[in-house]
UniProtKB/Swiss-Prot annotation:
GO terms for biological process: apoptotic process; cellular response to heat; cellular response to stress; lipid metabolic process; positive regulation of apoptotic process; protein catabolic process; stress-induced homeostatically regulated protein degradation pathway. Interacts with BIR1. Changing S235C: Impairs BIR1 degradation and death-promoting activity. GO terms for molecular function: serine-type endopeptidase activity; serine-type peptidase activity. Changing P942F: In strain: YJM627. It is found in: Nucleus. This is Pro-apoptotic serine protease NMA111. It is an enzyme of class 3 (hydrolase). It comes from Saccharomyces cerevisiae (strain ATCC 204508 / S288c).
Length: 997
């Protein structure tokens, strides 16, 4: 199975283990073949069966190489007409399977009904959307009609009437023809290619099911067939055919360390197919016991008597082992009756030699009692168990609330960890339930809001009673560690993630129908609370009091706006106005205002805050909380009015990762311009600033803090700066920022104004005097620099220019001499114009004198106010917006279209080829230069239909795609910030109608 996402395991590339100790040899299949003989006869007599693809009589004559080649060629040419390439999306995370887009293989097993056989890990246990492509490149939608609860097979259905240009042929299933030494071909979509034909020979037919690892789907309680065919991702679901064109097995998985492949036998698959064809329920029984095939020598060590061994060897002379209980689930039908290590002798009087016999008996006796004879430590026991319904312990619904998804713990997961099949399983640890950013799956929710959650229905009822924005206690644990229960508090988000839905599987339509459970309860009224503030433990009293000016700022982003991850972020903040509630904080934590912001005082009380200001280049933001809610002795600190210099002696006060305050004396070692590396996908980063470096070992352990004088005057901030993303990890740089870079904005806010910043939209760097001479800077300007510069001898140069439509603008390589007649000696001389204004800040014209290509040039450069994102559209699982500032900074020529800043893991956008950084310029040949036009066009596109899109890559390469809409799982919506209330309002579109949330 070829996966488009790098963090998803490929089924055929997973490391496997046999599940047995020692070498297993062949198990005689004579009884199995006779057991399926009646089923095959029933299948042959069924009126809808297509004639099998049979091309030669098996008369045991020896074929020459050329005859063998021609015969295989004839067979394959017919088989490929039944094989389809499956393009699918598993829409939602479910049972440890991530949401994904992928490709696999299937083959037609009933041409009249339009039934395709493939793997269960392709169909998936959760919502599925897909289509198939036939050999002649005809395309047809498919829906899932069955996925086995345990074994790795499932069925998809298509409408044969939609296939107009080819005659559909079905492959006949012949499980009895899978024999050791048989030459086979695996015909499928190997490694994402439309058609690959891989050759091999069957080497084993009695292998235990392979194990693919923890927290993923694993088959069990069945034999597997082994061969060496070197299949890889994408071949999942391929037919394994013999030279006569019969399907003898189903490709399922493979080893990463060898060319070994694993095929699922067709015996139980054939039985399920017949049930579907005859419109009968596919009953599946279980006593919740996992069996493994163990060789006789190991069975003897576990207590098998010589008499029973002799009987088994005589009855099954080719067998070398019996089934032994590996796992018995607590509270299951077999619990306290069967023990691990018990050897299975018979069921209902039938001597057992294979998994398929066990499956057959259990499937035929759901709800009935069966009698098992086992041997335990040399003693024979007879136990009676009531067969349970396997479908009843397989989740068929899930709940979506607070941005996370939940369902009942499945038999699949419970079996692997030997747990009772009960509990609320968190299949997507996100939103309010983002317990651990490193581990998204495998959590069990034991209680919430101090109420036990033994099952999904109880969980739903509890969640109905919890108001929006409330903080509640959750008890939970991970499947891999039953001995470590965990307790945390979470913030209930029912305003950004307002959906509270229950999705239920519908095997008739193939869609998971949903119903809305409950509307959000309004948030509880906030009450003022008190907090005691403990001074910083230092001898300097003025510095110690600064604990009354420090707090913690945390944010929860609603969506990955501006290509910034929607993570929960936290850092320290400086209270710059205790009376009005203003807090200065790193923009790493407050990248935009489409989020919830919280201020924590003294690690004692939390109050909500709003985003008041975002600096476009200097990496700081200002948020505001309601001071009436805080009854604590907070102090507005004294802020410095002079810039720091190299050699200044300071006090460093930092916050560790555990929010502990640490202090240290330090010295300013360097003040220089920095260039933070840009990310592959453009997003906010600090530019055009001079960073402070200090001589302090403690600072490397702190993610934030402040720099002060001995009298408590705040001289600077110690901030995290977001850099590039490498190997799915965010690179964060720690540097100091002079408080003088923030003073103008702070003063305007304190005086009741609204600060606005207008900047010269270009990137600047520094060069040495030597480089300036080489670039043609005249000697008189060099002498002037040497005379007037008090800090560092350098010239400022243009390193990049943002996109602009102005004819007169700076160019890369320009050396800046002066601005408005003032010599430019450092980056601070190029700071933007800061003022208080209502509406759009008018542009200012600045007189630049630069050296360009060795000549002095005078330029009038217009400043611009950076517009933060205040609107975006969600379409086909992608987030579309006007190109944000980071995009304009990175591009010279910006296409006229809506910009894709993000695409979902399982979305149509990903499946059909829209990437982050793409511009959608046309939809159905209509130009879409802005969001209004785009919305107008896409609202006319019906559900489940194709539209043509023309796009432009980040490198201005045009291309076109077709995209199929799916409004059931991926509706179109618009989120827009109200200019008066500054609240974000969501509108969801259904056809030409819309609903506001």
């Amino acid at each position: 199975m070829t996966i488009s996402l790098s963090n998803i395991k490929k089924r055929d590339h997973s490391k496997i283990s046999d599940g047995t100790s020692g070498e297993s040899s062949l198990v005689k299949r004579k009884q199995l073949e006779s057991a399926t003989g009646d089923q095959e006869e029933e299948y042959t007599d069924h009126e809808i069966i297509i004639e099998p693809l049979h091309f030669a009589n098996n008369n045991n004559t020896v074929l020459t190489d050329s005859e063998n080649y021609l015969r295989w060629q004839n067979t394959i040419s017919n088989v490929v007409k039944s094989v389809v390439s499956i393009h699918f999306s598993q829409v939602a995370p479910f049972d440890c399977d991530s949401a994904l887009v992928s490709e696999a293989t299937g083959f037609v097993v009933d041409a009249k009904l339009g039934i395709i056989l493939t793997n269960r890990h392709v169909v998936g246990p959760g919502p599925f959307v897909g289509y198939v492509v036939f050999d002649n490149h005809e395309e047809c939608d498919v829906i899932p009609i069955y996925r086995d609860p345990v074994h790795d097979f499932g069925f998809l259905k298509f409408d044969p009437k939609n296939i107009k240009y080819s005659k559909i042929k079905a492959l006949t299933l012949k499980p009895s023809l899978a024999k050791v030494g048989s030459e086979i071909r695996v015909v499928g979509n190997d490694a994402g290619e439309k058609l690959s034909i891989l050759a091999g020979f069957i080497s084993r037919i009695d292998r235990n099911a392979p194990e693919y690892g923890e927290l993923t789907y694993n088959d069990f309680n069945t034999e597997y067939i082994q061969a060496a065919a070197s299949a890889s991702g994408g071949s999942s679901g391929s037919p394994v055919v013999n030279i006569d064109g019969y399907a003898v097995a189903l490709q399922a998985g493979g080893s990463t360390e060898a060319s070994t492949d694993f095929f699922l036998p067709l015996d139980r698959i054939l039985r399920a197919l017949i049930c579907i064809q005859t419109n009968k329920p596919i009953t599946r029984g279980t006593i919740q016991v996992q069996w493994l095939l163990k060789p006789y020598d190991e069975c003897r060590r576990l207590g098998l008597t010589s008499e029973r061994e002799s009987e088994a060897r005589a009855k099954f002379p080719e067998n070398i082992g019996l089934l032994v209980a590996e796992t018995v689930l607590r509270e299951g039908p077999g619990y306290d009756k069967i023990k691990e290590g018990d050897t299975l002798i018979s069921i209902n009087g039938e001597t057992i030699s294979s998994f398929m016999q066990v499956d057959k008996i259990q499937d035929e006796n759901v709800g009935k009692e069966i009698q098992l004879v086992i041997q335990r430590g040399g003693v024979e026991c007879t136990v009676t168990c009531t067969v349970g319904d396997l479908h009843a312990i397989t989740p068929h619904r899930y709940v979506e609330v607070c941005g996370a998804t939940f369902h009942e713990l499945s038999y699949q997961m419970a079996r692997f960890y030997a747990l009772p099949v009960r509990g609320v399983f968190l299949s997507s640890a996100s939103g309010s339930f983002n317990f651990d950013s490193k581990e998204r799956v495998g959590w069990i929710v034991d209680s919430i809001d101090n109420k036990e959650t033994p099952d999904l229905d109880t969980f739903i009822e509890i969640m109905k009673t919890i108001p929006d924005r409330k903080r509640v206690t959750v008890r939970y644990h991970h499947l891999t560690d039953q001995h470590s229960p965990l307790v945390t508090s979470i913030y209930i988000d029912r305003h950004w993630c307002n959906e509270f839905r229950v999705y239920t599987r519908n095997d008739t339509t193939g869609i998971w129908d949903y119903k809305n459970v409950a509307d959000p309860l309004p948030a509880d009224a906030l009450k003022p609370r008190s907090a005691k503030i403990i001074p910083i433990p230092v001898n300097n009293e003025k510095v110690a009091k600064l604990s009354s000016s420090l707090c913690t700022v945390a944010t929860m982003a609603a969506v990955p706006l501006d290509s910034l991850s929607a993570d929960i972020l936290k850092t320290s903040g400086l209270i710059i106005d205790a009376e009005k509630g203003y807090v200065l904080v790193s923009r790493r934590v407050v990248p935009h205002d489409c989020l919830d912001t919280f201020v924590t005082i003294a690690d004692s009380l939390v109050v909500p805050a709003t985003v008041e200001f975002l600096h476009p280049t200097h990496n700081f933001a200002i948020v505001k909380y309601d001071p009436e809610l805080v009854k604590a002795p907070l102090i507005t600190p004294k802020l410095s009015t002079t810039r720091m210099k190299r050699g200044d002696k300071l006090q460093f006060i930092g916050f560790t990762q555990n929010d502990r305050i640490v202090t240290s004396e330090t010295t300013v070692t360097d003040i220089s311009s920095v260039s933070i590396p840009s990310n592959l996908i453009p997003r906010y980063r600090a530019t055009n600033l001079e960073a402070i470096s200090i001589d302090c070992n403690v600072s490397t352990r702190c993610n934030s803090g402040i720099l002060t004088d001995n009298d408590g005057t705040v001289r600077g901030l110690w901030l995290p700066f977001l850099g590039e993303r490498l190997e799915n990890k965010e690179k964060v740089y720690l540097m100091g920022l002079d408080i003088m870079d923030c003073r103008e904005v702070i003063d305007i806010l304190k005086n009741g104004g609204k600060p606005r910043v207008s900047i010269v939209d270009a990137g600047f760097g520094s060069i040495s005097v030597l480089q300036a001479r080489i670039r043609g800077v005249p000697e008189e300007w060099i002498m002037r620099m040497e005379h007037e510069s008090n800090n560092r001898l350098q010239f400022i140069t243009v390193s990049r220019v943002s996109y602009t439509e102005d004819k007169i603008h700076l160019e890369t390589g320009d050396v800046i001499l002066s601005v408005n007649g003032k010599l430019v000696t450092e980056m601070n001389d190029l700071n933007g114009v800061v003022s208080s204004a209502d509406g759009i800040l008018p542009s200012a014209m600045l007189d630049f004198k630069v050296v360009r290509d060795g000549n002095i040039v005078d330029l009038k450069i217009k400043t611009v106010e950076v517009q933060e994102t205040d609107r975006f559209v969600i379409f086909a699982g992608s987030i579309l917006q006007k190109p944000h500032h980071a995009v304009l900074q990175a591009m010279v020529d910006v296409p006229k279209g809506v910009y894709c800043t993000f695409r979902g893991e399982s979305s149509p956008a990903l499946q059909y080829g829209i990437s982050a950084t793409n511009f959608i310029t046309h939809v159905n040949e209509i130009e879409t230069p802005d969001l209004d036009t785009f919305l107008k066009v896409v609202k006319t596109i019906p559900d489940n239909s194709y539209c043509k899109m023309r796009l432009m890559t980040f490198d201005n390469v045009p291309f076109a795609i077709s995209l199929k809409t799916n409004y059931h799982y991926f509706p179109t919506a618009e989120l827009k910030r109200d200019n008066i209330t500054h609240k974000w309002i969501e509108k969801e579109f259904t056809g030409n109608s819309q609903s506001e949330k």
